[in-house]
Structure formats: structure tokens, C-alpha cells
Amino acid sequence: MGDERPHYYGKHGTPQKYDPTFKGPIYNRGCTDVICCVFLLVAIVGYVAVGIIAWTHGDPRKVIYPTDSRGEFCGQEGTKNENKPYLFYFNIVKCASPLVLLEFQCPTPQICVEKCPNRYLTYLNARSSRDFEYYKQFCVPGFKNNKGVAEVLRDGDCPAVLIPSKPLVRRCFPAIHAYKGVLMVGNETTYEDGHGARKNITDLVEGAKKANGVLEARQLAMRIFEDYTVSWYWIIIGLVIAMAMSLLFIILLRFLAGIMVWVMIIMVILVLGYGIFHCYMEYSRLRGEAGSDVSLVDLGFQTDFRVYLHLRQTWLAFMIILSILEVIIILLLIFLRKRILIAIALIKEASRAVGYVMCTMLYPLVTFFLLCLCIAYWASTAVFLSTSNEAVYKIFDDGLCPFTAKTCNPETFPSSNESRQCPNARCQFAFYGGESGYHRALLGLQIFNAFMFFWLANFVLALGQVTLAGAFASYYWALRKPDDLPAFPLFSAFGRALRYHTGSLAFGALILAIVQIIRVILEYLDQRLKAAENKFAKCLMTCLKCCFWCLEKFIKFLNRNAYIMIAIYGTNFCTSARNAFFLLMRNIIRVAVLDKVTDFLFLLGKLLIVGSVGILAFFFFTHRIRIVQDTAPPLNYYWVPILTVIVGSYLIAHGFFSVYGMCVDTLFLCFCEDLERNDGSQERPYFMSPELRDILLKGSAEEGKRAEAEE
């Protein structure tokens, strides 16, 4: 083994040599990767310019309000349609046309109305003044009864027939319902089309389906939004509970690291065990109930997730998943029991480091605030870009007009050649688009918007990692702790990172952002190719997605350790990444023993907090806690606040545990350097604590013997 060490070190770089002047993070350093810093500043200026252009041309009202045939918004304050919030279709049957799928607009006149029609009435039968006044509100604005019936219907001034309707996503759709298996509107199974003929209700269904198909996602979003409006208060309470649990756990970990780790392990096993028991009880309870034996495949996708909870197969699937997870965790604990003891020692040392630099626990709030700014700017820019198209008008005709679907100008159309050749044609609003250079560049601007979001978000995360690494490295390389600790180590590390290493952070974030935007493009292409039958293309796409996923994980790992070296030595990104990689390769056994085991333990801690808060949220929002069952709000989908609480709890727990994770990684890298620089003698003493030295060196020796035995 001894003969192989020179070759091994030569292969993976040269070990650090003893330097009596080295006392931790170097203070006399220079700026690194200045070119990348300039690129970042130029990109930010360009990003601001894109935002200004988007905000100038964009109009979010196009998403919020429906638009009539003249491109005017329904229900918008300050307009003539302020009191007309609903969109009315003259002939809903025309919405069964393929044009709906191509242009997202029905080929029939549409107007804004105060309320949807609530009774049957044809234009032919609206003879009395009372009926005509009612009918007139569904005609085009400014309609005057100075034409014959045939001319009115030909010119599209009024609908041929009014059908009882109800509003759905601010649009009037026929009030269709089933009675004893028969489709009806009101009390009728057929309707008069206004031209003297009677048609079947199924024609209305087809038209409503096509129009409604474009709006189903928006309807789901509206219901989810309604759930948020009535449950946001309780969601915040759930997130506060998650924050309190995370903070309490971290505080206890500071003083009772060993005990808390074992308590965490046992609690995770118990929580999963309870989940298995609860799934089994629900599975048994549904035995014999009507409809509970329907399979998930036969049921298909349902937006109301409560339907799935009435199926035995759902609870069986949950029980199997939790059982597999329980078995995996127990097996890992059995095989990693000795390594867990070593990892606990490292966590104890990390707890002491956090205790001496307590302000590091508040830094995730800074990262959270900066990430919120990035998300808010990206989201608002994306919305304004997507709504910066102009109103496009198309020619619609019921007959065989050769100009159908061609672009037109509503102001000049009545006197145009197209109008003369196709007397029944109409020039009406079709969709939002445009053919200018700006409109052709919208897709590229959206990609740039997404890319800049990834770059800035990764930069914010990198800034946090370098800052925390600098603070914890100052703790490790203090020979007499805490006497040799510098004043305000966190603020000093933050200042050094921004002053000297903005370019290096931008470089690392840029590499990661490029990989992430490629993954987004691959996901987009994969969605477009789903309908294709080319198996080679599908296989190639799957392989590319897998490769770039692995590449992203590797770059994140390398960047994290490179940032630690930047915080300590102040070298540029490439040098830091190379030195960190070689240092890890020279200590590959310790990396496998410690780094991943501590990550596993922290993951269990996150699962414990998320599982506990998630179970509490489930029982609360499903009205299963008797004391407060009347307090829980009524919801369309109770999974909306539950999932929000679960995801939010994980992000909160991850924010707190990320401090510990960065601390462990920094201490581990410093420990590896300490072993190479020093030998534990009085002339070259170790900087690590005696407790950490004893258990880490002992564990490393055991792993080395095991590796030699395997060879």
C-alpha cells in the first residue's frame, strides 16, 4: 500500500504541504474570473431591458378577461364592458369546428353580456316588446331593429336562438344536465335552431366540449385559486409549525446531536409504520363498498383527487410504496450502523461550529428573499412576454369562402374585395399574435428569460454556499476555539465573496444554468414527441434526459466543493474545482463513509418534519380532528393546501438543514486538508478537535483495512 501512494497522489494531484503561516481563509486575495463578472453584469442589463420591453408591450388582461369578436375585454373596469363580465356565443354549435383547436376561438360572433340567458327564445318568436327587449341585450352593441329577420341573421347582428346557459370561467355555456340517462337543457331534449328546425342536445354538447376543452385547465386553476383564498391562513400556520419544528430540531441538535440523530431515525421509522397501518385500515374499510374495486386504469385521470381515495387500489399502492420505503431505510441503517456513528461525530462538530457562528442559521432567510426576487421577476416577465401579442383578426365564413382563416382588418373589411366575394364572411377577433420582428423573437426572449432565471438563482445559491463555507472554515482553522475566531466571520465571508469572487460564482452558476436550460428544452421536445411513433427518437430522448440529469448532479456536487475552496484560498473557479476534485479523490473512502451518510441522516430529518406536518395537515383539512373539524374551511380539492404545506415544509426544513449540510461539507474538506498539512505533532498540530480526530481517523483506518482486504 505504501508503494502505491506516490503514484496515487501523482494521479490525483499533489497533497497540500505544511505552511506555518496558514490560519484559515486567506484575507489578502484578488478578484477572480473578472470576465465572467462582466458577462453577468451585461446579461443583467439585457435582462432588465427585456423586462422593460415586455412590460411595455404586455397586457396581463388578455389572460384574465375573455375577449369578444372585436378584441375588447369583458368585465374590465374603466371600459364600456365594465358591467358585462360574461362572453356570449351566438351559436355554440360552431365551437365544434376544428378552428377552435387551431385558433382557440369559436367561428361565431361573440359579445360581452351582463348575464347569461336563462330561457329559451328564438329571434322569430321574440315578437312582444318585452321579449324583444330581453333578446336585444344579446345582440351586437348598438343594434337597431331596422332590418328584416333574414338580414339580421345573415349579418350576425343577433343570435338565431337563446338557450338557457350558465357561466363557466366567465363564458356562457348551455346548462346541460342528465336526467335518467337523457341529456337535457332545461326541460327539453331538443331545441329549435332559430331557422324553424329542431336539433338534438348532443349538438350543443359537442360545441360546448370543444369550447370547454380549451378552458378546462383554466377552470381547474380557478378552483385551486379559490381553495387558496379560503385556506391561505391555515397554510401559513402549517408552514409556521414546520419552521418551529425545524428550528427546535436544529437547537436540540446543537446540544444533543447524538441523541437527536437516533431519535430522528426511530421517529422516521415510526411515522412510516403509522402510514402503513393507516393505509391498511383504509384498505380494509373500503372492502365491500360500492365502486371501491374499480381499478386506477379504468378510472383514468380525475382532477378531483378525492375520487381516488374511495378506491381500495389507491390505498394498496400507498401501502406498498411506504412498505418498500420502510424496508429500504431499515436495511440502510443495518448496513451503515458503524458509519452512522462516524457521521454523528461529524454532525456534533458541525453543531459546535453552528453554535459559535449562530448567525449562520439566519442566512437562509437572505437566500430565500433573493430567490423570491428572482422568481417574481422571472414570472412577471414571462407573463408580460406571453401577453405582448397583438390582436389578430381572421375571416370566418360558414360556407366555402376561399379567404376563410386569412388575416383581415375589421375597419376596412366591409369595403374589401374579400367581403364582396364572400358576402356572409365576417372579420372577427381570432387570437393574440403578431408577425413583426418582436413577435417572431418572443420564443427566444422566453428562453432567455428562463436561462437568466436559472443563472441568477444559481448565483444566489452559490453566494450562500461561499458565505457559509467561509464562516465555517474560519471556525475550523482557528487553533484555539473560539478564541481565534475572527469577529463577524459570516459578514466577512459575505463581503469577500461579493468583492473578490462575483465572477467565479457567476462562472459556476453559468455552467449549471446551461445544463438546466438544456434539460428544460429536452423536456419540451419530449412532450412534443410523445405522439410520435419513432421508437429510436424516444429512446434517444430518454438517454439524453438521463445523461443531462446525471451531469447536473455532478456539476452541483463539484460546484459545491469548488465554492468551499474559493472561500478558503480565493482561487478562481477552475483552479478551485480541480483542487477540490483531486482532494476528494485522494480521500475517496472518507467521502463514501461520511459525506453521503450525513446527507442520508439529514434527509431523514427533513422527512420527519415533512411527514409530521403533512399528517397533521391531512387530518385537519379532511375534518378528522374533532376538536377543530368545524374550523377547517370547505374546499374544492383538499389536496391543494395539503400539498402546499408539504412542499413548503420541505423547503423550510431544507433551508435550515442546508446550513448544517454546508457546515459538514466544509469541515470535511478542511479535515482532509488538515491531514495532509499536519501530522498531529507539537510542531504541526491538527486543527480538528480531539473528539473528531479520534473517531474520524479510527473510522478511516477501518475503511482502509477493509479496502485492502477486498483488494
From Swiss-Prot:
Compartments annotated for it: namely: Cell membrane; Mitochondrion outer membrane
Keyword terms: Antiport, Cell membrane, Glycoprotein, Membrane, Mitochondrion, Mitochondrion outer membrane, Phosphoprotein, Transmembrane, Transmembrane helix, Transport
Q: How is it modified after translation?
A: N-glycosylated.
- Which segments does the topology annotation call Extracellular? 55-232, 278-315, 386-440, 526-563, 621-638
**Single GO cellular component term:** mitochondrial outer membrane
Summarize subunit and interaction data from the UniProt record for this chain.
Interacts with COCH.
Q: What is this protein called?
A: Choline transporter-like protein 2
Source organism of this protein record: Pongo abelii (Sumatran orangutan)
